[in-house]
A protein has these predicted regions:
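Acidic-enriched catalytic cores of C-N bond-cleaving enzymes acting on peptides and small amides
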Residues: 198-297
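Structural signature of cysteine-dependent C-C bond-forming condensing enzymes
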Residues: 43, 137-143, 148, 171-172, ...
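Single conserved hydrophobic/aromatic residue that forms the stacking wall/gate
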Residues: 1-6, 11
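Anion-binding (especially nucleotide phosphate/pyrophosphate-binding) glycine-rich loop
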Residues: 14-51, 79-187, 356, 363-367
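Glycine-rich, charge-dense phosphate/pyrophosphate-binding loop(s)
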Residues: 51-57, 61-63, 210-213, 221-224, ...
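FAD-binding core of FAD-dependent oxidoreductases
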Residues: 59, 66-72, 76-78, 118-124, ...
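Short, conserved charged micro-motifs
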Residues: 91-94, 251-255, 391-398
Length: 423
């Protein structure tokens, strides 16, 4: 544990480098940790505390495949939510979150879902506590100050990082660290679906909780297969750049909703619920039936799904063989398929705004053929992803920020840890 007096000492450079990978970020991370400890002391007094961390994530492969029980490849990144926390003897969890002055207090004898809390941080905390207890684990009181640099709305999964963080605290504080990363992810998903009221797949939570790269197969959606893939981007001399194209998510709900809906309509042509239950051969043999019954866009989206699903497995195979150039080619093909067939790069209801299309075009010009880019996450607005050689990062970042504004391009590393106790 660590107290303020020793906070400079207890946050060693080697620990920070191990977690955050990027040595240039060490002064920033050190300052952030010390400020978090100081904020904790302002709220709760000087104590011996523990520090926990849970990362954001980036989807690497499998664009819009999870809701059809397909496959996904996702990475945990070196942005995270951190908690400075202390165990309490009373049956209350008290949390202050950076940017919100209000203390959230959750009583452990009152963990039922509250409809009025839907969409709030309280709902996520209460949901994680309830499900952890329901699964037979010990829960107890603690107080924590939490700060996060996982950007909200930038497609890096801020809520999943938060849920993973609460689950990780409970695991280490009350269960000797024995709640598995996969179970913590499933607890987080439950909290988000049931208590927070947002239907979501399991990809975000899994990537935040497990760490490194995770390959997830959702064929059995109740018990997804999860495989951790070891991969060091730095060894290959590349960085992961996420650019916020500043496109608004407003009024895009119909566009997002149409994707799973049309894929399900294509699956319904075979009497199935989701496309994960239909083979490539079946889709190709019956394409005219899908076109007639569900329309051409549904047919194209079905073709994207079956090829994107295969691509995820090929990406995993390429990484296992350390064939990085093949991996990059597959990432590029994923992006091309999203643009051409999935069609989630701009909304056809407002063709004068195409932030993501512009970002992809500028990326390809800046990178020439040395790096690759793709839309990731939901699409239509928000962020794009690029794998950029380290020697081109400065050039790429400058070029993208000329178009999208200062700070729009975030240079990330893939971190090997999911939810962890740091100190």
């Amino acid at each position: 544990s660590c107290s303020l007096v020793g906070s400079e000492m207890c946050i060693r450079d080697s620990v920070l480098t191990d977690i955050y990978v990027d040595k240039d970020k060490l002064p920033y991370e050190r300052k952030r940790y010390i400020e978090a400890i100081e904020q904790y002391i302002t709220r709760f007094g000087d104590d011996d505390v523990w520090i926990y961390s849970a990362p954001g994530r980036s989807e690497i492969g499998g664009n819009h495949t999870d809701h059809q029980h397909g496959e996904v490849l996702a990475a945990s990144i070196n942005h995270d939510a951190i908690a400075v926390a202390k165990k309490l003897d009373d049956q209350v969890v008290r949390i202050v979150s950076d940017g919100y002055n209000n203390l959230i207090a959750i009583h452990l004898d009152d963990l039922d879902k509250k409809d009025k809390e839907e969409g709030s941080t309280q709902a996520l905390i209460r949901g994680v506590l309830a499900k952890t207890k329901e699964n037979g684990h010990t829960i107890g009181g603690f107080q924590a100050y939490i700060t996060s640099d996982v950007l909200i709305g930038a497609g890096l999964s801020s809520s999943a990082a938060f849920e993973t963080l609460i689950g990780t605290i409970l695991s280490y504080m009350y269960n000797q660290g024995n709640i598995s990363a996969i179970e913590i992810a499933m607890i987080g998903q439950y909290a988000e679906n049931v208590y927070f009221g947002k239907p979501c797949g399991l990809m975000d939570q899994m990537a935040c909780s497990v760490g490194s790269l995770v390959h997830i197969n959702f064929e059995n959606s109740q018990k997804p297969e999860v495989e951790r893939v070891e991969f060091d981007l730095d060894v290959h001399g590349y960085s992961l750049c996420i650019t916020d194209t500043k496109g608004s998510h407003a009024d895009l709900t119909p566009d997002y909703a149409a994707i799973p809906m049309e894929m399900k309509q294509a699956a319904a042509c075979f009497g199935k619920e989701v496309l994960g239950e239909v083979s490539k051969k079946e889709i190709l043999s019956n394409l005219s039936k899908i076109r007639a019954e569900a329309g051409d866009r549904a047919a194209l989206r079905a073709l994207h799904f079956i090829c994107e699903n295969e691509r995820v497995q090929k990406e995993v195979d390429a990484l296992k063989k350390d064939n990085f150039s093949e991996f990059l080619l597959l990432v590029k093909r994923s992006g091309d398929s999203s643009f051409k067939y999935l069609q989630n790069v701009f909304t056809c209801h407002d063709v004068s705004h195409q932030n993501v299309s512009v970002a992809l075009a500028v990326s390809e010009i800046l990178l020439e053929d040395k790096g690759v880019c793709r839309v990731h996450g939901g699409g239509f607005a928000g962020t794009i992803q690029a794998f950029v050689p380290n020697e081109l990062v400065e050039h790429y970042k400058t070029g993208m920020e000329e178009v999208f504004g200062s700070g729009a391009c975030d240079v990330l590393k893939i971190r090997k840890y999911g939810g962890i106790k740091v100190i």
